[in-house]
Amino acid sequence: MAIDTSLPKDIRILQAAEEVFSQHGYEKATLDEIIALADVGKGTVYKYFGNKEHLFYKLVADKNAPFLEKLRSAVDSVNSFEDKLKKYFEVMVHFYVANSTLWQIICFEMLGGNNGCRVKLDGDNFKVIPRYNSVKVSEETSERILRYHKILHDEYDILSQLITKAMQNNLLKHDTVPEITTKFVFFGVVMSIFNQSDDIAADMTDEEAARIITDHFLRGNAR
């Protein structure tokens, strides 16, 4: 991939970072390769982004913000619960297919699984806790994990609000637990996209995928 050297340096660095992170994942990606592809000096990267982790976060945060706006606009553009679900999943599927590798890095490398950590709701906030007694979570690690957790939480919280309102309006079973239901559906879709076969990716439109997801969520697989 060639980077247009007429672009501003920070844009070139972000474009190069997306290419390198997508090829190698987070841990194996190097700033040296990003610097070479962007055709900038090492000091320029540190000037704009500080370090590799801050660069990666800037890359995904800049993608996440317009994605959230599209999700909100999509669900607000229709009236019925079923149509809102379809619109939500249309936007979600399109984004996750287009950004699959970067969001796999968030899920599998940045959320603490490799460090023996997980995120738990604590009152109105989230906190990082160790999965095992021998694991010690540093403040720096905790802050990093929570940054990436917020990206995903903001995405599925829009779905959670839809499900909560539908339950309150007697459109879903009264024993529905919004948090469990939301994560079950959201991360089920996410993992399906991360692991989809090539023929499904090539043949299925965002609209068709959203229709199937919504239909299975509301009606199941029973005939």
Language-model features: locations:
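Basic, helix-initiating cap at the start of DNA-binding domains
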Residues: 1-24, 28-40, 54
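C-terminal peripheral helix-coil segments that are non-catalytic and often amphipathic
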Residues: 94, 157-169, 183-223
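Amphipathic, non-transmembrane alpha-helical scaffold segments
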Residues: 56, 60, 64, 85, ...
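Amphipathic alpha-helical segments enriched in hydrophobic/aromatic and basic residues
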Residues: 21, 26, 30-31, 41-42, ...
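Short, hydrophobic secondary-structure boundary micro-motifs
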Residues: 104-106, 174-175
